[in-house]
Amino acid sequence: NIYTYQNFDSIKDNPEVDVVYIVLPVGLHAEYTIRAARAGKHVLCEKPMANTPEDCQKMIEACQKAGKKLMIAYRAQYEPFNLDAIQRIRKGELGRVRQI
C-alpha cells in the first residue's frame, strides 16, 4: 500500500485507507487535497493550508462535494510529549498555567 505521485489516484480503490495525510510542500497541498477528496478519502493537511485563498476555497469545496472532512493541523499536537503536557495541564499537575 505505497502510493507515489504517479499512482496516487489509485488510492480510491483501497478501502483500508480512510484518511490521507498531506505533508507535501505547500504548493502541492491544494492539488493533493482535491485528488484525495475525489478518491473518497478524508484529508488531514499540514499548515499552512495553501498558497492562496482561492486554493483554500477549492480544497474546501472539493471535500464538501465529496462529503469528506478536511482538517488543517500541525503534527505537534499529536506528538507524545505534547499529549502528555496537555494531560498534565488538564489535571492541574503543573499549577495554574498562564501562557503556552
Model-derived features: where do they sit?
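Short, solvent-exposed coil/turn elements at secondary-structure transition points
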Residues: 8-10, 76
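Conserved SAM-binding strand-loop segment of SAM-dependent methyltransferases
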Residues: 2-7
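Alpha-helix C-terminal capping/helix-to-coil transition sites in glycosyltransferase folds
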Residues: 13-16
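Beta-strand-loop-alpha-helix segment that lines the small-molecule cofactor/substrate pocket
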Residues: 19, 25-26, 30-78, 92
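Oxidoreductase and adenylate-handling cofactor-binding alpha/beta cores
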Residues: 78-100
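Short, Asp-centered acidic motifs that coordinate Mg2+ and/or phosphate
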Residues: 18-19, 99
